[in-house]
């Protein structure tokens, strides 16, 4: 039937586009990590993505509060705020350490990194819920699997790097 065809078509289209996105992500990550002057920027954005995930988890566990969405029921507003705060601390400290300079643009960059990581996390949580996958592993206790750790990074790094280009 037409409905089944469309469902399969969009599933294959999504998989195809995701493979292209992941390939481009890996390609640009490789390019950035091989250029020494861009390596600091790349790793600062990566540390910001990791900080976003950790800050959200820790603040959410400590302060709890209202839930953000049903897509990912453990996400709270306190976790979202903690994610932004911790990302700001890590990114500004990292850039100050490497450049001995601080700019207000670092705060804007940090907020963009954190929000894009949170959106990426929610987006992939939505996809996993649709596919009826709860966790993608237990490598990080309380954090889900490796893919759960990568959810935010897959959106955070590209948005972080694009933001640096625009803000610079």
List the model feature ranges, each with a label:
Residues 162-168:
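Juxtamembrane boundary at the C-terminal end of a transmembrane helix
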Residues 78-79, 91, 146-147, 161-162:
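Juxtamembrane/interface motifs at transmembrane-helix termini
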Residues 23-26, 156-161:
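Hydrophobic cores of alpha-helical transmembrane segments in multi-pass inner/ER membrane proteins
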Residues 1-76, 80-115:
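Membrane-embedded alpha-helical bundles of polytopic integral membrane proteins
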């Amino acid at each position: 039937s037409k409905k089944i065809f469309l469902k399969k078509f969009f599933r294959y289209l999504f998989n195809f586009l995701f493979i292209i996105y992941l390939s481009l992500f890996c390609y640009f990550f490789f390019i950035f990590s091989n250029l020494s002057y861009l390596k600091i920027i790349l790793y600062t954005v990566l540390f910001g993505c990791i900080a976003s995930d950790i800050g959200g988890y820790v603040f959410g566990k400590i302060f709890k509060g209202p839930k953000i969405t049903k897509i990912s029921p453990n996400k709270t507003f306190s976790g979202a705020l903690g994610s932004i705060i911790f990302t700001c601390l890590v990114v500004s400290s990292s850039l100050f350490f490497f450049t001995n300079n601080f700019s207000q643009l670092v705060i804007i960059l940090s907020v963009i990194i954190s929000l894009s990581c949170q959106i990426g996390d929610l987006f992939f949580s939505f996809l996993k819920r649709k596919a009826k996958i709860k966790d993608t592993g237990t490598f990080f206790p309380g954090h889900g699997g490796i893919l759960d750790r990568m959810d935010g990074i897959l959106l955070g790094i590209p948005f972080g790097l694009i933001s640096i280009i625009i803000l610079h």
